[in-house]
Amino acid sequence: MPFLGQDWRSPGQNWVKTADGWKRFLDEKSGSFVSDLSSYCNKEVYNKENLFNSLNYDVAAKKRKKDMLNSKTKTQYFHQEKWIYVHKGSTKERHGYCTLGEAFNRLDFSTAILDSRRFNYVVRLLELIAKSQLTSLSGIAQKNFMNILEKVVLKVLEDQQNIRLIRELLQTLYTSLCTLVQRVGKSVLVGNINMWVYRMETILHWQQQLNNIQITRPAFKGLTFTDLPLCLQLNIMQRLSDGRDLVSLGQAAPDLHVLSEDRLLWKKLCQYHFSERQIRKRLILSDKGQLDWKKMYFKLVRCYPRKEQYGDTLQLCKHCHILSWKGTDHPCTANNPESCSVSLSPQDFINLFKF
């Protein structure tokens, strides 16, 4: 009777015992045997070559299909949890460490840009990454970075808000990429050089779209900003944290120009962003012998960083070392999780992953 070989190297074919020893059973219906061992070996080699070529073809086809899908997709890699555990070293329970790219993929920045409280925070974070941390991201994180940036540009084109902020972000990114592309071959960027050249052309196209944007007047015919009392207008202008916004607002109407030159307004703006010591080092007098707070502000901006304030920020739980957005639930074992959370500025977020 036929015997099935148990050798793990056997291809699983049948063997029968004859007077001359064990021989391979070729065709059960005809009952013929393989007597010529060389012919069998040649056939086996032929079958293996066909199998190998078939596998190579399947793998290549799957890879082309995967690359095509990856090149067309515009969505961020999605994770169900909106938090990430930040660990900087290996332990018995957890090996490896958390990287900036991993945190960037997990914290759902695509949804965060739709929230007006988080928009400026995300844009500032994108700017810091574009300046110095782009090479720290993995290939997937770099792709997510460009996808999120595209969503930011589309949102600005639709809402017609924060145009100058995104212009500066795109210019910063383009300048960084010009430097990094010239160093190709030194493992500074992940991906093909042609892909990064295409991305740079896309950035130039976005810049052109932002430069050509036309602000449309709303159809609303009700009360406008200039119809408000002067004291209320001045109170609203004091809420602006960027001096360039005050200058732009003053160019909108002659009455607003007078308010935008108010010395007390610029004095409070200087005191908000800079310390008394910094202000004393950059005193500027006007022709009338008074402090020119407007000129002092723009000089201080060139010398010192401005104070950053955001409506919503990322928070780090000191108890469980979990990073998440404010108001996002995370598995914390502390009795009072809110007291353990510390707000992180965009720069603090970057520094968190410097080892």
UniProtKB/Swiss-Prot annotation:
GO biological process, one term: protein ubiquitination
Motif Nuclear export signal positions after renumbering to this chain: 169-173
Pathway: Protein modification; protein ubiquitination
Keyword match Cell membrane: no
Protein name: F-box only protein 32
Listed result of changing residue 243 to R: Found in patients with familial dilated cardiomyopathy; likely pathogenic; impairs the formation of SCF complex; reduced ubiquitination of cellular proteins
Record PANTHER family: F-BOX ONLY PROTEIN 32, LD30288P
Residue span of motif Nuclear localization signal: 62-67
Function per UniProt: Substrate recognition component of a SCF (SKP1-CUL1-F-box protein) E3 ubiquitin-protein ligase complex which mediates the ubiquitination and subsequent proteasomal degradation of target proteins. Probably recognizes and binds to phosphorylated target proteins during skeletal muscle atrophy. Recognizes TERF1.
TM regions (residue ranges): none
UniProt entry keywords in alphabetical sequence: Cytoplasm, Disease variant, Nucleus, Ubl conjugation pathway
Annotated disease: Defects in FBXO32 are associated with susceptibility to dilated cardiomyopathy (DCM). A disorder characterized by ventricular and impaired systolic function, resulting in heart failure and arrhythmia. Patient are at risk of premature death.
Motif Bipartite nuclear localization signal, chain ranges: 280-295
Matching CDD domains: F-box_FBXO32 (cd22103)
Tissue: Specifically expressed in cardiac and skeletal muscle.
